[in-house]
Amino acid sequence: MITNISIFDMDGTIVDSSHRQATLPDGTLNLDAWIENATPEKIFKDKVLPLAEQIRKRHKAGDYTMICTARVMSEADYEFLMNEGINPDKIISRPLGNTEPDGQLKAKQLKSLFNLKQFKKATKIMFDDAASVRSALRKIGIATIHPSKVK
């Protein structure tokens, strides 16, 4: 029986991809530029952040581990994670063509998954650097932590 679920965002939480990010005048992510910069060459220049070690630790401790990212995942993204030894039980990502705000997207995807019998009663915690995501997930009963709060 699954009792604990640890969920990790990618960008800004377990992966530093800031070299590929562009923002709009209001400070939000320029999704079109992000997708344009999602080439294998640029993805392989991403850096793993220290919190990524928690995925390994929590998995070893028996947690069901997940990545929930607003990225549209490509083969290069999966290869990058594998090369870095980041092997969660499940990865949830943005569907191609979806432009929903990150918090809304992640809340919808996780709520749907956590309605499944095996996940309903588990304790759920999400590590995410985005305040809007943390707020949206708290509204559906998922505890959230900013990566800077983890020692």
Residue ranges of model-derived segments:
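Short amphipathic alpha-helical segments and helix-helix/interface helices
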Residues: 52-56, 110-111, 134
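Short alpha-helical
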Residues: 72-76, 105, 132
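Short loop-to-alpha-helix "cap/lid" segments that border enzyme active sites
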Residues: 81, 101-116
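Acidic, Mg2+-coordinating phosphoryl-transfer loop and its flanking beta/alpha structural elements
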Residues: 121-151
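Alpha-helix termini
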Residues: 55-59, 114-120
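A short acidic, often aromatic-flanked loop/helix-cap motif at beta-alpha or helix-coil junctions
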Residues: 96-103, 132, 150-151
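Alpha-helical substrate-recognition element adjacent to the catalytic core
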Residues: 2-100
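Short, aromatic/basic amphipathic alpha-helical patches
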Residues: 78-85, 113, 135-141
